[in-house]
Each structure stands twice: as structure tokens, then as C-alpha cells.
Regions:
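Charged C-terminal helix
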Residues: 216-256
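Structural motif
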Residues: 9, 17-19, 35-38, 64-66, ...
Length: 256
């Protein structure tokens, strides 16, 4: 089950059996039988301000794993209030761009004693910070997730020119992928859904790395077969379906 509130990403979930809902009671009931869950704050409705914190609490209370995509963290009072509330009942994995991770780290007060933290200006849905600028923030957030995780571990995935995944201690860099991913809508949001699919069957760090590698390989294949953003988006779906485990396993992983 994914509680995904980014309309443009709905059609891009592949290989997982997804149930998507805007209704809090439906989400909470469905979570009981779900392997993992996904909350995306990309498109908000007024009642989400109360509904999403309630859902996070129920997931935590019932020991359910879930993935958060903090889309446009730092923009708007409602989105900020929702994301701040997740500090108490946090997700198992956070997936976002560098600016979103830095903003979430600041919102949760994890960076208050770190004078090296970049400015926490709102960045919208596009990153204005490099992945390297988010390393410390990502590690702090991952350690915070692990404290509350029903499986005793958490992970943060930072998307960028070279993706980064950390469990709070170890840092993995994942070269590759396609710059065309930044030219279409819903790519990051659908990656969150795929991450949740992996989280249903793997520990958080493995799930976050596997999903990111899958998307990197598929996007490379799609770019080679497409002529622009429109054809790339369609070809990416086919590539996600057809990419093999061997192709993903051959990916380069750099350990800091």
C-alpha cells in the first residue's frame, strides 16, 4: 500500500501491488495488510494536515515500515507542519533531493549544534544544493529514523547527479542514471513507491540502495532509446519492467 498524494506518479509504480488512497481511514485499514507504506507530500489537500500525522502515528503504533518523500520541504505552512509532525513518529526510509533532506534535518532540529549546515531556504521541488552538501544532514536523519524504526534501522536516499544512500553510519554513492530524469514529472515520487516495494522484502539500507540502482539502470536504458522527455517517460516504464537483476547487480557502488 502506498498513500501517494502526487497525482503524476500514480501511473509509474511497477512490479509492486499498490493500493493508493486519499482517505485516512482507508489508508489506516489497508496498512494492516500492506508489506510497506509510502507517504508523499507533493500534492496536499486541506484535511491532510490532520490526517497524515494520524496515519504516521498509527503506522508507528502498529510497527509498520514506511517511506517518506518530503517533496518541497520548507515550502508552505501546511506542508511544514506535516513534515515537522513526522519527527515524533518518523518513517523508516526518507527519499528526497539534497535540499529536501537539508530542510527536513533542520525542521526536526537535528542540526541545531552543527554550524556547517547550509541555509535552510525553501527550495521547491528542485534541488538548489549539491548532494555533497547533504551528507551530514542525511546521516543525522538516518540515525533519527533508526531510533524509532520497527526494524531497528533506517536509511536516507538522496537523489542527485550521483545518488547517495546512508544508514547514518555508512555512506554509499551510486554513480550513473540519466539527466533526463530531471526533465519529466513524477520520477522521484515513483522512485519512492519502488523504494517502498523493496522495503516490504528487505532491510531499509538494502531497499534504498536497490531501488536507486534499479532506477539508475532503467533510466540509462531509456535515455539510449528515446529522443526527448516525452518518449523517455514512456521508455522508462518499459525499461523498469525489462531491466534484469544482473544489470542492476553490475552497478558501481562507491563506499565512503
Amino acid at each position: 500500500m502506498r498513500f501517494c498524494i502526487r497525482d503524476g506518479a500514480k501511473r509509474q509504480k511497477k512490479r509492486g501491488t499498490a493500493a493508493m488512497s486519499f482517505l485516512p481511514d482507508d489508508v489506516i485499514d489497508t496498512a494492516e495488510i500492506a508489506g510497506s507504506n509510502y507517504i508523499n507530500v507533493g500534492t496536499l489537500l486541506p484535511f491532510f494536515k490532520d490526517a497524515l500525522p494520524e496515519i504516521a502515528y498509527k503506522l508507528h503504533k502498529n510497527g509498520k515500515t514506511w517511506v517518506l518523500d518530503p517533496v518541497a520541504a520548507g515550502i508552505g505552512k501546511t506542508r511544514t507542519a506535516i513534515l515537522e509532525s513526522f519527527r515524533t513518529y518518523p518513517p523508516t526510509i526518507v527519499r528526497g533531493n539534497a535540499s529536501e533532506i537539508i530542510a527536513l534535518d533542520a525542521m526536526w532540529g537535528l542540526a541545531q549544534h552543527d554550524s556547517t549546515v547550509p541555509g535552510t531556504r525553501p527550495a521547491g521541488v528542485e534541488a538548489v544544493d549539491e548532494v555533497d552538501s547533504a551528507v551530514d544532514a542525511a546521516k543525522r536523519v538516518a540515525r533519527h529514523l533508526a531510533k524509532y524504526s520497527p526494524v531497528g534501522a533506517g536509511a536516507v536516499a538522496v537523489s542527485g547527479a550521483v545518488d547517495l544512500v546512508t544508514d547514518g553510519e555508512r555512506v554509499f554513492r551510486l554513480p550513473g542514471g540519466s539527466a533526463m530524469m530531471t526533465k519529466i514529472t513524477g520520477a522521484g515520487c515513483s522512485l519512492g513507491g519502488v523504494t517502498a516495494t523493496y522495503l516490504a522484502v528487505a532491510e531499509p539500507l538494502v531497499a534504498a540502495i536497490s531501488a536507486s540502482l534499479l532506477y539508475n539502470r532503467a533510466s540509462e536504458i531509456a535515455e539510449a532509446k528515446s529522443s526527448g522527455p516525452g518518449s523517455f517517460q514512456v521508455t522508462l516504464l518499459d525499461a523498469l519492467w525489462n531491466v534484469t537483476a544482473e544489470e542492476v547487480a553490475a552497478s558501481e557502488i562507491i563506499i565512503d
